[in-house]
Amino acid sequence: MNILAARKYQTPRNGPLTLEQTETRRLAYSIKSTASPSIDFDTAAREMAALITGPCWLVPIPDSNGNTDANTRLAHHIARHVNANAAGIGAQVVKAIYRTQPVQSQCARHKLALGPIAPEQHHLARNRKVLTLRQTYFVDNVTTSGHTLEAARLALGFGAGLVFADAATRRTQMQVTLF
């Protein structure tokens, strides 16, 4: 699974955080809620948009309860900053996946010292929206194990992850070309 991340998500367990690392954590939590200031969404979106080019699809990842509001808002902010191609097509937001039943949030699981949820236990499914052939990115605030993004890819059949922060201890960051 290819995952693009604007920032690395550091944990205080590895020592004191710098001001930049603290701000990354604050922004990552902030963009989980639509009630957060637009400037937080825009800050994250600018950095995420710099990792991709249009034309592309931005598919919001449903949260643990199936709500896509926060990630849809983030995706719309990203779309505003993605450069369009010669035909004027940039990034377009499409709700192409949904959660068939709630799952325990990764944040809650982490607090209980539980491991990640396996991709097949995320209960993500593709809806009937037709996507034309172009780069497709699953939009989320943070990735830990990558299993949610992998579940989205399995549900849709293709796509790469686009996150604000990557909390994995080891993962290669790269620009993705799917076609």
Regions found by a protein language model. Give the residues of each.
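Short beta-strand-loop/turn "lid" adjacent to the catalytic site in phosphate-handling enzymes
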Residues: 57-73
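A phosphate-binding catalytic loop at a beta-strand-loop-alpha-helix junction
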Residues: 139-152
